[in-house]
Amino acid sequence: MAKTIGLLGKKLGMTRVFADDGSVVPVTVLEVGPCPVMQVKTEEKEGYNAIQIGYDALPERKVNKPAKGHQEKAGKGYFRHLREFPLESVADYELGQEISVDIFAAGEKVKVTGTSKGKGFQGVMKRWNFAGSRASHGAEKVHRSPGSIGHATFPGKVFKGKKMPGQMGNERVTVSNIEIVDVRADENVLVVKGQVPGPKNGLVMIRKTS
């Protein structure tokens, strides 16, 4: 995994923009940072280089004692979300330093990580894109069933990983090589091409690819 810097933000929603040739480009608008550096880890002390950043300010009354002791060291208040980014070098970062959206540039490719929308308990046709059984010609009450899920006496079990009905969504998803369309540093806004995981106001992590 590339050791690159990133930021935290939230998904504001989707819209569209028009390219120079007149084509319509669907985009997602993200509110990103600014994120203060809450901790700097060094190879000498912790065994690896990394920085920890904070996002989404919290009032002091909502922070427990251990979290308060940790976050007070940066002198930037308290935050709901903390994320760590392993880096090759931390020489350019110091405790309390604010990292803003201007570390990104239009045309750059990034990775976006979020929590996908929860869909609840779903069948195999929705969850795994199964074709289902026949609509008629002898098919009865099995139109959306998965069909066979294994063998007979041998091996006498259903193998692990078999695609079956179950909980769908509400899991960590990363989408790579998303192109940045626009960076609005004065508004802390990042406009990226296409869609990103999660609902409106959902937490997202944006990382550089190199």
Curated annotation (Swiss-Prot):
It comes from the Bacteria. Residues 139-165 are annotated as: Disordered. The keyword Cell membrane does not apply. Keywords: Ribonucleoprotein, Ribosomal protein, RNA-binding, rRNA-binding. Pfam families: Ribosomal_L3. GO terms for molecular function: rRNA binding; structural constituent of ribosome. GO terms for cellular component: cytosolic large ribosomal subunit. The keyword Ribonucleoprotein applies. Coiled coil: none annotated. SUPFAM superfamilies: Translation proteins (SSF50447). GO terms for biological process: translation. One of the primary rRNA binding proteins, it binds directly near the 3'-end of the 23S rRNA, where it nucleates assembly of the 50S subunit. Part of the 50S ribosomal subunit. Forms a cluster with proteins L14 and L19. Belongs to the universal ribosomal protein uL3 family. This is Large ribosomal subunit protein uL3. It comes from Maridesulfovibrio salexigens (strain ATCC 14822 / DSM 2638 / NCIMB 8403 / VKM B-1763). The lineage of its organism: Bacteria, Pseudomonadati, Thermodesulfobacteriota, Desulfovibrionia, Desulfovibrionales.
